[in-house]
Amino acid sequence: MTEFTHINQQGHAKMVDVSDKQITKRTAVAHSSITVNETIFKQISNNTNTKGNVLNTAQIAGIMAAKNTSTIIPMCHPLPLTGIDVHFSWDETNAPLYTLNIQTTVSTTGKTGVEMEALTAASATALTIYDMTKAVDKGMIIGETYLESKSGGKSGDFQRQSGQ
């Protein structure tokens, strides 16, 4: 059984000491999504939302969120991130509902992984899209948020299998 590393001998929270870990290249890819109605889909696609360019703003929010993960997730280490990317792709198969898939990739060269940074980026990206379009429809659905893959570090690589 795996032990919880963020709990000390007294049962209280602690931040894990990574001093003795090896410096390696670490990358994590996370996914989230938001399902919107046709009006919002058209506003985003045609860049006609009155608050501005929704995707550009959400992309910047995702990048900022990754950079600030350690300030909102208590046991995360502050990391010198070396790369953050946010990609979007529309799924139009269930029109008149449209799902915007969000994929975030975060990398560093360091002593601990960037899974939480990638997940935080994906979440903040979806939340920003909701915030910028909620005046049109508050019924949007933010979908599952999950880690797609990670590489580097002591625990090795991870690749989510379909259906996992």
Curated annotation (Swiss-Prot):
Residues noted as binding substrate in the record, renumbered to the chain: 75-77, 116-117
Record keywords, A-Z: Lyase, Molybdenum cofactor biosynthesis
Active site per UniProt: 131
Reactions catalysed according to its record: (8S)-3',8-cyclo-7,8-dihydroguanosine 5'-triphosphate = cyclic pyranopterin phosphate + diphosphate
Function: Catalyzes the conversion of (8S)-3',8-cyclo-7,8-dihydroguanosine 5'-triphosphate to cyclic pyranopterin monophosphate (cPMP).
Assembly with partners or alone: Homohexamer; trimer of dimers.
Family per similarity comment: Belongs to the MoaC family.
Full protein name: Cyclic pyranopterin monophosphate synthase
Protein species of origin: Staphylococcus aureus (strain JH9)
Gene: moaC
